[in-house]
Curated annotation (Swiss-Prot):
Native organism: Pseudomonas putida (strain ATCC 700007 / DSM 6899 / JCM 31910 / BCRC 17059 / LMG 24140 / F1)
Protein name per UniProt: Protein SlyX homolog
Matching PANTHER family: PROTEIN SLYX
One Pfam family it belongs to: SlyX
InterPro entries: SlyX
Similarity field: Belongs to the SlyX family.
NCBIfam families: PRK00295.1
Length: 68
């Protein structure tokens, strides 16, 4: 294998690696967006849950059944 052939091979590999790195970066960016949306949704659900517990009391505070 000549030096020129080795250089071409290395440059080809580098081009494929650059493409792979860009594709992986795109996936990471999209996952970060999804995580951010999920965190916002979770915060909203926690807020709603706390409001409901405040309105109706927690499960431990249930009144006894009517037959008591």
């Amino acid at each position: 294998m000549t030096l020129e052939m080795r250089m071409v091979e290395l440059e080809t590999r580098q081009a494929f690696q650059d493409d792979a790195i860009q594709a992986l970066n795109d996936v990471v960016v999209e996952q970060a967006r999804v995580i951010e949306r999920l965190q916002l949704q979770m915060a909203e659900l926690i807020k709603r849950h706390e409001e409901m517990v405040g309105q109706y009391g927690s499960e431990g505070e249930e009144a006894p059944p009517p037959h008591y």
